[in-house]
Amino acid sequence: VTAGPLAGRIAVVAGATRGAGRGIAVALGAAGATVYCTGRSTRAGRSEMDRPETIEETAELVGAAGGRGVAMRCDHTLPEDVDGLRARLERDEGGRLDVLVNDVWGGDGLVEWGLPFWEQDLGAGLHAWRNGVESHLVTSHRLVPLMAARGRGLVIEVTDGDRDDYRGTLFYDLVKASVIRLAVAQAAELAGHGVTAVALTPGFLRSEAMLDHFGVTEERWRDGVAADPHFAISETPAYVGRAVAALAADPGVSRFAGRALSSWVLAREYGFTDADGSRPDWGRWFADVVQAGRDPEAVDPSRYR
């Protein structure tokens, strides 16, 4: 058995319960890493998201992929919870941390669309900010010192979008733009410490929640295209997961410091594919079809996969 490119590496995926976080954790496991899968949803109890996926399930998938998965409940908005995670890394891994993925979101159900911000629920918007930005800052504040002390490491801030275009509703936009800015700021401050920080976005993500939204399974995902033709360019969480694994295995990753990267650009850079062997290019589709105002049903989606 050949050791994976990340054998012996220690990763934390904060927000590994479902969606991009789960895809990232599993891809890191497939590359041989030990992956701490953290979040609030466990077999003992659900988070406010009230969904069935759990961190234990993700850790088992990491193991099945060839890595070592460790599930640990952690509310990343609470410094004391993240301190507990750091203490466990110090105890069980000698304080080693090679890859930190800040993927916590927790904003579905808090973000409102179609209303001006002043008519939206302020408490819900601030809660989305706390879940989606404060959690990242708390986690980096407590865990980045482990990397800086060793003079090496990679921080990946998972966001939505790699451009400055407005995302349609204020609180959502503020959270996702701030996550990119966190990567920029961390990259600047960590440059002299051997640690690289980047932001990373998936395209149109076929998460568990998105499949539920369209009323389809992963096996029958194309049935959702009738409801939204843009869904034809969607991608599985494995795609952004493979992007993270490729970055983590790249000894020259510092060339990307402070950049907002995407699954589709990195697929071209590193040559990986989505789970079905295709390469969905949401960026090109967005430019050619969405921004150009073309009828998506008149465009052949296979040219963008």
List PLM regions with ranges.
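Active-site loop of short-chain dehydrogenase/reductase
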Residues: 9, 67-68, 95-97, 147-161, ...
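Catalytic loop of short-chain dehydrogenase/reductase
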Residues: 106-110, 118-124, 128, 154-192, ...
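Conserved internal alpha-helix within the Rossmann fold of NAD(P)-dependent oxidoreductases
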Residues: 125, 132-140, 154, 164, ...
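A short, exposed helix-loop element centered on a Lys and neighboring polar residues
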Residues: 140-141, 184
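Short-chain dehydrogenase/reductase
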Residues: 2-95, 105-118, 305
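C-terminal helical subdomain
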Residues: 134, 199, 219-305
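A glycine/serine/threonine-rich, flexible loop-to-helix segment
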Residues: 50-51, 115, 192, 204-230, ...
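Rossmann-fold scaffold of SDR-type NAD(P)-dependent oxidoreductases
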Residues: 14, 97-110, 132, 156-159, ...
